[in-house]
C-alpha cells in the first residue's frame, strides 16, 4: 500500500511511501496523476480544491486552501492554513455508544502495596524538594549503589532531580509540591527518600503535613542543613528503606488494574494512521475490561476538542472539558502567544500541516470510549475509564504529568523518534517501520507494520503481549538506556 484515503469524505490522501511526480494514483475508481513529488506522510489532493474551500482529512476540515489546488498537487503549509480562532463556544452534543466486546483481560505479575495500590516496578526513589540539593542527592545515590551492588534485589535506585522548589509562588509552588507528593505516593516506588535543604519555599514540614497518610517505614525525610554529614545520613536512610522494600515480590494480577498514559511526540503524517489508532484500540480494550487510560496534551486537542466533548459521559464532565480547553487557550493569550502555531518543524517535515491536522491525529489515541473525568494538572486518577488531564504538549512535562496522575506506564507514539523517558516505563511506538529499524535502541514497538499488510487485530494482540512483558518486568528502551526524567509545569514568575 503506497497511499491511503482515511475517510470517505476526504479530498486528500496520504502518501505511505515517497511518491514521485507523475505517479498515477487510483482512489474511488478515479485516477489522479501526481503533479509533484510527495514524501511519505504528506498529503496530495484527490480533487480540485477551490481557494477558500476546506481541506478534508479524517472526514473533517484541517484547514482551508490559500489558493486553488489542483488534483494531484502536494497539500501542505504552502497552500493550506488553519481555520481555527481563539476562544470558542461549545455545545454538549453527546455522541457515543457502548464499546463492542473485547478480548479477555490478561494476567500480569505486579507488586501489591499495603494501601491497595499496585505497581509494575519496585524502585527506590530519591526526591529533592529543591534543586539546591541535586548534587548532594547524586552523591548519596552513587555511594549507596556501590555499597549494595546496585541495590540487588530491586528494580533500581533513581534520583529525579529538578530545578524548582524555591523562588516560586502561587500555582508554580503548588505544582512543584503536588508533583513531588504524587511521586512519593506512586506505587512503582517501593520506598522514597525526600531530601530538603532547609530554607527553601518547599519546606519539608509543610510537604509532610499536606502529603496525607504514608508508611513511615517506606518514606523517609532528611533536611540537609540539620545534618552534620548529610551524605552519610542520606546513605543510612537509603539502607533502612532498602532493607524494607528489597524483599517485595510480584504477585498475579490483571492488566486492567494498571493505569496507562497516552501520549505522542515527534509526530508525523502517519501518526494518525498507524500508532495512534492502535493506541485507541488498546485504550478501548483496557477500558472494556474495567481499566483506566488518560489522554493529555491539551494544546493538541485544539481543533479536535468537539469530538472529545461529544464523548463526555454527562454535561458536568463536558463543562469541565470546556473549562480545561478555554483555560489553556487563555494561558496562550495571557502570554501574547498565538494559539494555533503548534506543529513543530519536525511535525511539518513529517507531513502535518495545521493544528487541526495534528489534533485529529493525536486524539485517535482516545479510541471510542466515553470520557469519564477531566482532571486538573496534579490531580490523581480516581475513575476507571477514559480520563483527560490538563497539561501542555511538551513531551517532558506531559509524560511527567501522566505519571504523576498515577499512570504505571506511558504509551508514547512517535514518527520522528525521541529517546525521552519519564519516571515510569515509557513505551515508544514508532508510526513507521523505517524509524523502528533505524532506532532499535529507542523504539519498543513498530506500529508501521499496519501499512505493510498486518491487520489491526493482529497488531493489537502483539502490542498487548508487549505491554504484558513490560508490566512483568521487562525493561523498556528508556529504562535500559537509563533515560529517566522529571519535568514540572511552570507558568509564573521566578523570584
UniProtKB/Swiss-Prot annotation:
Field pH dependence: Optimum pH is about 7.5. The activity at pH 6.5 and 8.6 is only about 20% of the maximal achievable activity at optimum pH.
Matches recorded under InterPro entries: GD_AH_C, GD_AH_second, SAF, UxaA/GarD_SAF, UxaA_altronate/galactarate_dh
Reaction(s) this enzyme catalyzes, per UniProt: D-altronate = 2-dehydro-3-deoxy-D-gluconate + H2O
Regulation of this protein's activity per its record: Is inhibited by high concentrations of Fe(2+) (> 2 mM), and by EDTA or other iron chelators in vitro.
Pathway: Carbohydrate metabolism; pentose and glucuronate interconversion
GO molecular function ontology, one term from the record: ferrous iron binding
Induction cue: Repressed by LeuO and H-NS. Part of the uxaCA operon.
The keyword Nucleus is assigned to this record: no
Cofactor: Fe(2+); Mn(2+)
Keyword Transcription assigned: no
EC supergroup of this enzyme: lyase
EC numbers, comma separated: 4.2.1.7
Keywords assigned: Iron, Lyase, Manganese
Coiled coil spans: none
Co-factor remark: Mn(2+) can substitute for iron, but in higher concentrations. Cannot use Fe(3+), Ni(2+) or Mg(2+).
Family the entry assigns: Belongs to the UxaA family.
Name used for this protein in its record: Altronate dehydratase
Lineage start: Bacteria, Pseudomonadati, Pseudomonadota, Gammaproteobacteria, Enterobacterales
Amino acid at each position: 500500500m503506497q497511499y491511503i484515503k482515511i475517510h470517505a469524505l476526504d479530498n486528500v490522501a496520504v502518501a505511505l511511501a515517497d511518491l514521485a511526480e507523475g505517479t498515477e494514483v487510483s482512489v474511488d475508481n478515479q485516477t489522479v496523476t501526481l503533479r509533484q513529488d510527495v514524501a511519505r506522510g504528506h498529503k496530495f489532493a484527490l480533487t480540485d480544491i477551490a481557494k477558500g474551500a476546506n481541506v478534508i482529512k479524517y472526514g473533517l476540515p484541517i484547514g482551508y486552501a490559500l489558493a486553488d489546488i489542483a488534483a494531484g498537487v502536494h497539500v501542505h503549509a504552502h497552500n493550506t492554513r488553519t481555520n481555527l480562532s481563539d476562544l470558542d463556544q461549545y455545545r454538549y452534543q453527546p455522541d457515543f455508544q457502548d464499546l463492542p466486546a473485547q478480548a479477555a483481560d490478561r494476567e500480569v505479575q505486579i507488586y501489591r502495596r499495603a494501601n491497595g495500590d499496585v505497581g509494575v516496578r519496585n524502585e527506590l526513589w530519591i526526591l529533592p524538594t529543591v534543586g539546591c540539593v541535586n548534587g548532594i542527592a547524586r552523591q548519596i545515590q552513587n555511594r549507596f549503589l556501590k555499597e549494595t551492588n546496585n541495590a540487588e534485589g530491586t528494580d533500581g535506585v533513581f534520583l529525579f532531580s529538578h530545578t524548582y522548589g524555591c523562588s516560586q509562588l502561587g500555582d508554580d509552588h503548588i505544582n512543584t509540591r503536588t508533583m513531588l507528593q504524587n511521586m512519593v505516593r506512586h506505587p512503582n516506588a517501593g520506598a522514597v527518600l525526600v531530601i530538603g535543604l532547609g530554607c527553601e519555599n518547599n519546606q519539608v514540614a509543610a510537604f509532610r503535613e499536606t502529603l496525607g497518610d504514608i508508611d513511615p517505614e517506606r518514606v523517609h525525610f532528611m533536611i540537609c542543613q540539620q545534618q552534620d554529614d548529610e551524605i552519610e545520613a542520606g546513605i543510612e536512610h537509603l539502607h533502612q528503606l532498602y532493607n524494607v522494600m528489597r524483599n517485595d515480590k510480584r504477585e498475579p494480577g490483571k492488566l486492567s488494574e494498571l493505569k496507562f498514559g497516552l501520549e505522542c511526540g515527534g509526530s508525523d503524517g502517519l501518526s494518525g494512521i498507524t500508532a495512534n489508532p492502535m493506541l485507541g484500540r488498546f485504550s478501548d480494550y483496557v477500558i472494556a475490561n474495567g481499566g483506566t487510560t488518560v489522554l493529555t496534551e491539551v494544546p493538541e486537542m485544539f481543533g479536535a476538542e468537539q469530538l472529545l466533548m461529544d464523548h463526555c459521559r454527562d454535561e458536568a464532565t463536558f463543562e469541565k472539558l470546556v473549562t480545561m480547553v478555554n483555560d489553556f487557550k487563555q494561558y496562550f493569550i495571557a502570554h501574547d502567544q498565538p494559539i494555533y502555531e503548534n506543529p513543530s518543524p519536525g511535525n511539518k517535515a513529517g507531513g502535518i500541516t495545521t493544528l487541526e491536522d495534528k489534533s485529529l491525529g493525536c486524539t485517535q489515541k482516545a479510541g471510542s470510549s466515553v470520557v469519564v473525568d477531566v482532571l486538573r494538572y496534579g490531580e490523581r486518577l480516581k475513575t476507571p475509564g477514559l480520563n483527560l488531564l490538563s497539561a501542555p504538549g511538551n513531551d517532558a512535562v506531559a509524560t511527567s504529568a501522566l505519571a504523576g496522575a498515577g499512570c504505571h506506564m506511558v504509551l508514547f507514539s512517535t514518527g520522528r523518534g525521541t529517546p525521552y523517558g519519564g519516571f515510569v516505563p515509557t513505551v515508544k511506538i514508532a508510526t513507521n517501520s523505517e524509524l523502528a529499524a533505524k532506532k532499535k535502541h529507542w523504539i519498543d514497538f513498530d506500529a508501521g507494520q499496519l501499512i505493510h499488510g498486518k491487520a489491526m487485530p493482529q497488531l493489537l494482540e502483539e502490542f498487548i503481549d508487549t505491554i504484558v512483558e513490560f508490566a512483568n518486568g521487562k525493561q523498556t528502551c528508556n529504562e535500559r538506556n537509563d533515560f529517566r526524567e522529571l519535568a514540572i509545569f511552570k507558568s509564573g514568575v521566578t523570584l
